[in-house]
Amino acid sequence: MKKVFILTGEPSGDKLASKVISKLKSSNPDIEFLSVGGEHLKALGIKTLYDLKEVTYLGFTRVLLNIFKIKKKINETVDRIIEFNPDILFSVDSPDFTLRVAERVKKLEPNIKTIHYVAPQVWIWRSGRVKKIKNFIDHILLLF
C-alpha cells in the first residue's frame, strides 16, 4: 500500500490540498494518508496530527513571539513523518513552514519523494532559494 503525507501550514493550503487529494483518493482508494491539515482534509476522512492553528501565525510579530512553538512543531512534524514512512511527502504552500519540514525529512530519509504544490515566489523574494529548494524537492506543481 502506498502512503502519502500531506503537509499544509494554513487554511488556504488545506483547501488546495483537499482538491488534489480528493481526486487522488477517488482514483486510488488504497492509498494511506496522514496529514498536518485542517477542516477540508478532515472532511475527506484524512487524519491530521494537530490543528493548523498550532502552526499558523500571520505577521512578523506573531511569528517572532511564537518562534519556539513553531520550531517545536517543525521538529515534531519531521519526527512523525519519518515514523509514518510515506512514499510521498506532499507539501502545500506556506513555504516558511512546509519547506523547512520537507528539507529536514529529505535529509533524514532521501528515498521519500517530495512534491511541493504552489511554488514560492522566488523571483520576487529570496531569489537564492531556487538553488536550495532543488536539493530537497523532487517536483514542484504550479497554480495556473
PLM features: residue spans?
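Active-site and donor-binding regions of nucleotide-sugar-utilizing enzymes
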Residues: 3-144
